[in-house]
Each structure stands twice: as C-alpha cells, then as structure tokens.
Amino acid sequence: MAAPMEVVVCTDSAAPLWSCMVWELHSGANLLTYRGGQAGPRGLALLNGEYLLAAQQGKNYICAWELQRKDQLQQKIMCPGPVTCLTTAPNGLYVLAGIAESIYLWEVSTGNLLVILSRHYQDVSCLKFTGDGSHFVSAGKDCLVLAWSLCSVLQADPSRILAPRHVWSQHTLPITDLHCGFGGPMARVATASLDQTMKLWAISSGDLLLSVLFDMGITSVTMDLAEHYIFCGGSDGSIFQVDLCSRPGPREQSFQPEQNTGKVFKGHRNQVTCLSVSTDGSILLSGSHDESVRLWDVKSKQCVRTVPLKGPVTNAAITLAPPSMLNPEFRPSLPLPHFNKHLLGAEHGDEAQGGGLRLQLGLHLQGKEPSYLERLEQLQAALSGYLEKNMLGSQMLPVRVFELEEEVRSLRKINRDLFDFSTRIITRPSK
C-alpha cells in the first residue's frame, strides 16, 4: 500500500487568478488551484477531508469548496463581521471563527450557531483545536490566551457567562500565532507574540512550562509531530529552532543567535507568517511577507526549494492529502448546510429549526398525566363556566347540559371500574 501523499496548501494576499494552491511536497508539482477570493491570515481550514474553507480577508463571509470541485464555489457562509481566524474540529463536527473580539461556534451537520464566546477584549487572532477535539485555544490582540473545554462550552447554561478552563495572561504584546501539540487534554500549547517571546503551556495543569526570549518579535510558531523542537519565525525573516529534549534548564530562557548558529534558518527577507513541519520531521515549510514559500532541510538548515507567489503569504501548511482531494469521482458524504448568523432560538423562539430532531421522552420520563378524577373536575369546572356565560333561556342549553351530565356519569363509571380492577389485582393472593 502506497504511503499517503503529503501536500502543501498555501494562499497569498494578491493572487489574481486563484485563492488557494495545492502542490506536492517533495516534487513541487501543482495539483489543484481554487478560485473565488483571497484568504486572510489564519483563515484556511480543511473540513472533514471533504471541504476547503477560506475566510476572506477583510470581508464578512467564508468561502467553501468541495475538494474536487475546485472551479465551483460551493457556498458562501455569511458572518456578522469580517473573520479574523478560522479552524475546524478534527472530527469535522464543528467550525470555529473569530469575529472581532468574539468566537463563533457552528455545528456542521445542521448549520446552527451554537454559542458566541465573548471573553477577549480585542480582536481574536488565532484559534486551534487539540488533536482529539476535546479542547480549543484562542489568542488575541489583547495579549490573552484562553483554553476552552468544548464539552463545557456546549453544555453551559446560555444565561451565564461562559468561562474558559485556563486564562494565560503572561504575554505583554499581541499574540501572533499558536500551535497545539498532540495529547488531547494533556497537550502542550506554544504561543508566539510581538513581545519577543515564545511560551509553552500545559492544558492539563495550566502551568507555564517554558518561556524563551528572542531579540525580535515572533510572528509564527510550530512544533514537529514528536515535539522534539519548536520552530519560531521572526519579524526579520529568521527562523529559530528551540530544542525541547536538551538537558533541563530554567523555565525562562534567552535565545542568543550568535551562540546558536546551528539552530537558525536564514533566507527570508521579511517577517515569517506561517510555519509547518512534515510528518517525519525532516522538512520545515515557511511562508513570508517576502512573497515566497520555502522548504528547509531541518538537519542542515539549508533551503531546498523556493516557491515564489504573487503577494505576501497568508497561509501555508503541510498536510496529508485526503482521499477526496485526489479522487475525481469523490463526493461529500453530506451536503454543507446553510450556516446561521444568529444563535439557535434567538430569532424564532426555542423551537428546533430545519435539520434538527425532536426527541420525545419515554413514558417513565414523561410528566404525570391527569387522572380521571382530575379530568372530571376539569369537566365540571368547564360546565359551570359554560352555564354562567350562556343565557339560561337558550334552546340548546338543556340539550348541552344533558350531554355533559351523561359524559360525567360515563367518566364516573370508568373511574369506578378502574378502581375495582386495580383493587382485585393488588389484593390477589400470590401463588
């Protein structure tokens, strides 16, 4: 069985003919191009291996393509404002988008907007799910990093303000990028900031594990799959490699390029906007505002390929090609629904909207039904009200009274028979 193909998915801010380009990692062969707009930074995501989502730069909608129908825009997902960052759950069930200082969470199967999280004070700049989808992390220009439990967010009382699991506030300038490692709730999160630091956090405990100070602002960050190294892109185009498996050191460190000459990648002429590592950890991908994507050999720190683009690179990542990307006959398992702009129940009450299911509880979970005596009392009350509201001289009144009295007698007999039957069953001697 052939090994899965690794591909590069990248976008820039000035491509006149295409929105996103996909090319094979090792050969550089162009495989696919998608047309329909310009994706903003941190605004590109694959959805369940079937759709490609791109948040349009400075616009209030997200473009969605089927992976194989690259020339036909499938849908425009309208949003309440310009989308600043975008991500999807690994299982394909949820979509997260940062809009201004709020986080919007959609359910993919129905298109319902489930929750709006408003705990940032300035624009949200980064969003990432953990590998198992149990948590997600948000970061913003307000220097805050928030770790959220997805289960807690979905089960929270809408009337209460949702609280993140952890609030990390040690950065002093806007956060530019973040990366979630593997491990689910035990994962580690790396964050990059213009305050010239990269920080490493533990989701399980909320502790700060490592802080590295550089001599420039850090604009991108990533880790290899084994989490042996952290790669940090600088504002001047340099890329720094931080070793996580060296001998134990202090929690707060300073990276000196002159003392770590073998751990610096040099070649870009402008700030590094995105970083990604191949599955075997041997190749580092970088995108920059110098309008180029570069591939680096991690061991030698040499650039092995440069791909020129038409504008500053906004997104670039290495990923395993989904089967649908290379199969022209593939079609999505489910069509992409219409995504709502308003919270579920906000516009049309609490009734389930189209695409939802109405669940009926079992008999043992349903509320107690009224007995025949209670129904009889209700009937007598209705009869009294009827007599009071209607004229006594009406010709139909005696007939209606007779009918109601007959119904009362019938209900009394039914209730008496049920009582006798229940008494016989309860008092029947056991064999």
Curated annotation (Swiss-Prot):
Compartments it resides in: Nucleus, Nucleolus; Nucleus, Nucleoplasm; Cytoplasm; Dynein axonemal particle
One GO CC term, this protein: nuclear pre-replicative complex
Entry keyword annotation includes Cytoplasm: yes
Key word RNA-binding present: no
TM stretches of this protein: none
Keyword annotations of the record: Cytoplasm, Developmental protein, Nucleus, Repeat, WD repeat
Subunit structure as annotated in this protein's UniProt entry: Component of the 5FMC complex, at least composed of PELP1, LAS1L, TEX10, WDR18 and SENP3; the complex interacts with methylated CHTOP and ZNF148. Interacts with NOL9. Component of the PELP1 complex, composed of at least PELP1, TEX10 and WDR18. The complex interacts with pre-60S ribosome particles.
Protein task: Functions as a component of the Five Friends of Methylated CHTOP (5FMC) complex; the 5FMC complex is recruited to ZNF148 by methylated CHTOP, leading to desumoylation of ZNF148 and subsequent transactivation of ZNF148 target genes. Component of the PELP1 complex involved in the nucleolar steps of 28S rRNA maturation and the subsequent nucleoplasmic transit of the pre-60S ribosomal subunit. May play a role during development.
Protein name: WD repeat-containing protein 18
